[in-house]
């Protein structure tokens, strides 16, 4: 089965009444590492810290809508780092770029996984205050949204939801906090995570973030963990806000290491090698199993099928996750069409989400009626 999809403004085809937690969203782990390194850091970054080859604008263009951003504190600004290695991207510039992308494409929305990269701090004990001040800037207030359990696609269009792993204040300035995050392969702990917003808005969260696969059997454990979460997420039914269950399923990890000052640490090729296994596993899962939501999948080398000597299949995976939405959301016949354009009579789309001008007989399509509703349709002649 082909799972390719058109990435441009792909969220415009999502039904408005869909709960946000039900959308399958492709994401980029350490998203800024494809945008280059700070002066003098090219060698270190390319060997140890690169997880992406595409820049932030290129990731957006290929369909990425979840961004893992890891700010740290410098004297006059906040920088995006991967560990000790600084990228060339200031956090403020990344927010500006993403907001500009949303303003230019108001059908789309973004989820940000935010994590304080403490190893990169050049100023101590300043993160909490600085992050609050930055998130309060007037420049992007039109783009940011507070978390609610019952958020739907229609609420999110043109918006960015920032969810922080660090509790930088009693309540989030905007967005939400992650709670009980775990990198362990312990199913009870993985299902005990939460997303906590203002005014007691709390949603259940299942998380898989097993990040070190370089030991013998590590990759196999990672793939098994990914598939276990996929089994859970694709079979979980959300018919009301009480059933909302978020999922963050990391494809990212490193399976090879390099030595730095006598210490074995993650390597860029380690992220590449791991991706060859995890990306293939997810692509196979989506093509071989009944469709259903996969949540947010954060991957390395997103949008890139070949990185160096490694067959990462990152473009194929992004397209498969996008296309997956239109395999299961088409079954929801009572949801309204997401398009902000005037609905047309009998507009037909393939199950992968591509509009069809001349449909073939004896094939299944998604029909968007004049009432804006989506239904499956089999053409018999």
Model regions: which residues?
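Long, acidic (Asp/Glu-rich), low-complexity accessory segments flanking structured domains
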Residues: 2-62, 75-109, 254-331
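Conserved, mostly hydrophobic/aromatic
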Residues: 59, 70, 112, 162, ...
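Active-site groove signature of glycoside hydrolases
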Residues: 73, 105-121
């Amino acid at each position: 089965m082909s799972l390719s999809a058109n990435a441009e403004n792909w969220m415009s085809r999502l039904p408005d009444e869909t709960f946000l937690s039900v959308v399958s969203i492709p994401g980029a782990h350490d998203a800024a590492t494809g945008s280059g390194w700070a002066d003098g850091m090219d060698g270190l970054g390319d060997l140890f810290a690169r997880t992406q080859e595409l820049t932030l604008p290129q990731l957006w263009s290929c369909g990425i809508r979840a961004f893992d951003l890891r700010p740290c504190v410098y004297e006059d600004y906040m920088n995006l780092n991967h560990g000790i290695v600084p990228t060339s991207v200031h956090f403020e510039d990344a927010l500006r770029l993403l907001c500009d992308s949303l303003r230019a494409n108001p059908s789309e929305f973004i989820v940000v996984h935010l994590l304080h990269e403490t190893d990169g701090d050049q100023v101590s004990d300043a993160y909490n205050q600085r992050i609050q001040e930055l998130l309060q800037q007037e420049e992007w207030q039109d783009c940011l949204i507070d978390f609610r359990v019952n958020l739907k696609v229609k609420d999110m269009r043109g918006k960015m939801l920032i969810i922080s792993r660090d509790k930088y204040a009693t309540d989030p300035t905007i967005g939400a906090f992650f709670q009980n995050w775990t990198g362990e392969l312990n199913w009870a702990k993985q299902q005990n995570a939460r997303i906590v917003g203002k005014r007691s808005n709390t949603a259940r969260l299942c998380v898989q973030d097993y990040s070190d696969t370089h030991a013998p059997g590590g990759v196999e454990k990672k793939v098994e963990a990914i598939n276990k979460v996929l089994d859970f997420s694709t079979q979980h039914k959300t018919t009301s806000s009480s059933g909302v269950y978020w999922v963050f399923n990391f494809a990212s990890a490193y399976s090879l290491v390099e030595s730095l000052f006598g210490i074995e640490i993650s390597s860029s090729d380690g992220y590449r090698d791991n991706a060859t296994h995890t990306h293939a596993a997810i692509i196979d899962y989506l093509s071989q199993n009944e469709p259903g939501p996969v949540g947010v999948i954060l991957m390395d080398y997103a949008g890139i099928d070949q990185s160096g000597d490694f067959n990462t299949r990152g473009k194929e995976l992004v397209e498969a996750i996008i296309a997956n939405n239109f395999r299961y959301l088409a079954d929801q016949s009572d949801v309204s069409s997401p398009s902000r354009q005037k609905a047309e009579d009998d507009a037909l789309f393939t199950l992968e989400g591509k509009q069809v001008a001349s449909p073939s007989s004896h094939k299944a399509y998604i029909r968007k009626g004049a009432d804006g509703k989506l239904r499956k349709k089999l053409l018999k002649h």
